[in-house]
């Protein structure tokens, strides 16, 4: 994170001229978004606990939810993979893998990037959030969405072929 955050999150290519790379965690209502502007802030956010809460320019004494932390971790993985062709051995971008046992709305098979976009909507309280199981039922709850993003984060942790969950749920 320390080495690559500024480069991978520098969307306009001019950070040397004053642009600050950011990773934004949406929050609904009047709370306002949490904006992480450095690798140090990302690491502090991910390490925050009840005993050591997170503070920066956008929040003070904040305890991130597990879903918010999982969202940040998956965002880092997808962004680093897209930015650095050597991030993984695969030629397929992480964000473009399909999450085959889930749907957006009733028919669309989401990619990992789509799951991130839906997670943003969920965190922001956006009524267009529509991620669900392919087998039917309502939209995923906070707990179900957290578990999905956690599984995505763990999918290739320590295994070049993916976890058992990844092998059953991810495809091209």
List the model feature ranges, each with a label.
Residues 1-172:
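Soluble extracellular-acting proteins and domains
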